[in-house]
Amino acid sequence: YIVEIKEMDAGLRGRNGIAVVADSFWTAQKARDALQIVWDAGINGTVSSDSYSKKLKQKLTEPPTVIIEEKGNNDEVFKSASAKLETDYEFPFLAHATIEPVNCTATYKNGNYELWGGFQIPGNIADTLPALFGVKRENLKINLTLMGGGFGRRASIDNASEAMQIAKAIEQPVKVYWTRTDDIQNDAYRPAMYHKLSASLN
């Protein structure tokens, strides 16, 4: 099976794509590798870690847009200081990279969905996905399993949304799991940061 994954902002953070369904992971992987798809990367297609790092560094040369707290006359203190220290700290985007990549098992039958997965906040799934799929909350049963690490990543509901779409499309039980490459490419990253710290000593 080749199943289209449609864009659902609340469930997939605006993503869409194609799911390959087979009777084994190896077969599905080989079938996916054989697909020739041209993706439109959109306005962020040229953005990279390097280009974003340069943008952050450039922002530090501009006047601040927000000052959280300011006491005394910092400019005068720095001018009269006998010694000065200044350094930059950069923190890159970080993926959760859980030991167990994102996955979810789902069934669909007669308007009822059932999920199995290591969900950190199952209430998010119960509160959000029934409405998106046009069913009542009681038509979705969630079974919690052990998880190989979470770190906040399994608070997202994108894997559950994908599994529900595929299960309904093929009307068979389906186990959705991402490769490590999928996991890294589609994670909700910890934000990158760039800081400049200056200190004066007397």
Where are these predicted regions, by residue range?
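Structural alpha/beta core scaffold segments of enzyme domains
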Residues: Y1-N202
